[in-house]
């Protein structure tokens, strides 16, 4: 993320400057992985338009398009895309337009919205991040139509076990 963002990648060599040069590190890393273990074992994740701390990209469409078009020919196994908080940036459609591998999408889905996204061909698969943390039995809950436990945002990305290993399995009448 830091290499792709123009506000943090202030390098003046071949790895900084325009979107193509900022993407170079990611491109070379993916190329090396594909060469070493094969494209079928390599996937990568992007989060266009998602700021983190002071890292943001003022032109995430250009940066993302540039990266995806550059690595399209590598034929990686999958691309995992996190939705942008700014809904004017449709990260999933951007990925579909500029990359042609299996697309895994993440947008804080609930089971019903995940199903809708797959039916609408927004992605080939969905991922559950936060809900996976707060539901150790996520698969069983979804399959059984049981409600998902809410996650505690205060415990995300913190040290220790609290919020990671202390959520209970679903129980009837709980």
Where are these regions (language model features)?
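Flavin-dependent oxidoreductase catalytic cores
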Residues: 1-174
